[in-house]
Amino acid sequence: MDITKLEQKNKCIFAIKLAEKASSYLQESNVKGLINEAIEVSWKWVHTEENLGEVLYNFLDNEENGFTLFQEMEKDEKNISAWDCIIDAVAYVSRAAYEKEGVKYLPEPIEIVDDNIFTHMVQSLILCDSMECEYIEKV
């Protein structure tokens, strides 16, 4: 399947589903709650298209509990790959939300997000477990 040919909303749904799957590799409870919250906000944006770009971005780049900080502290390669997938997915939905809002100036990390991120997102999930290829094909 060529993900880049999907409509924007369907690309976001695909990204969220990969993030949900990747989150199963991260067991720490306080982190799991934040990931679930980010996924819920992502789904909310897909269903409502409310102005949630900034809210989603704050899950990624937050001085106290940003996903990028948690990833930097991670030692386990599988967990780092899971974080890669989750961060990519939230960044993609954040970009879509910002664009829908008509925001002219995006945060620098979001500015570089485009459809090429799907290759990295998929590879990251497969690095968690090669059996995830089957899941990805079903999505």
Regions found by a protein language model. Give the residues of each.
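Structured binding/interaction patches within domain cores
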Residues: 2-139
